């Protein structure tokens, strides 16, 4: 072998480039590639300077908080205005009172509607000039039983029509529409009568709807008895329920329509008080008529 090849060739000497700080005559910008590397081995990002990030966060956070607060205030104001407008048309807060019931109240109230003859205390209890919720007072009117009884009446009517091969959605719809129409007519007639007689009472329209809707409980009992025992069972049960509803309405409405005389302990005398008593009896007496009119065609 050659003697020169036995030795490693000496390393080539690296030629240093020109000083970066000395710019050539034709160079437009300084070459900073040879400058010191920042701590961490990363170069600063010139597109987003570090000094601008805290300032931007400081400015954007108050603006976002202000926008959120302003939006929440607008939403709360809009909700409040909507609730006020709805309450003007439909008193939602008052209607909630009529659905404040429980299972015990529903059972006792249905028993009172079917057997009102042994009940003694018919006065509605008050707490701070406000009637207590129905679940605490069996004498308080409610809408839960009338609404559920109305729906159940429509279902039982459909069952009765089905057993007679007369069921159709159109007939069932007419049945529901006629029952609702008669209820509205009844309530409007009572309101007109109270206005003509000039009765100062705390009865509201919702109270009248509740009292007028209690008769559906007896109507359901009559139709079911007719399906099980024929016309004889229908007439017997419907007659009992009709008399019970008349007794219930007289004892309940007497304290409402004759509230002034009852509060003063005055006997029902004079033309005005007698007219109020006749009105109470008329409202109660019309209940069995509606009960028969809306159910007689369902039993054959």
UniProtKB/Swiss-Prot annotation:
Main location group: endoplasmic reticulum
UniProt KW Iron keyword: no
Keywords linked to the UniProt accession: Endoplasmic reticulum, Golgi apparatus, Membrane, Protein transport, Transmembrane, Transmembrane helix, Transport
Cell inner membrane in keyword set: no
Membrane-spanning ranges: 143-163, 179-199, 206-226, 228-248, 279-299
Top-level taxonomic group: Eukaryota
Residue ranges, Extracellular side: 164-178, 227, 300
One biological process term in Gene Ontology: endoplasmic reticulum to Golgi vesicle-mediated transport
Pfam families for this protein: YIF1
Segments on the Cytoplasmic face: 1-142, 200-205, 249-278
Role according to the record: Functions in endoplasmic reticulum to Golgi vesicle-mediated transport and regulates the proper organization of the endoplasmic reticulum and the Golgi. Plays a key role in targeting to neuronal dendrites receptors such as HTR1A. Plays also a role in primary cilium and sperm flagellum assembly probably through protein transport to these compartments.
Protein name per Swiss-Prot or TrEMBL: Protein YIF1B
Source organism of this protein record: Xenopus tropicalis
Gene name linked to the record: yif1b
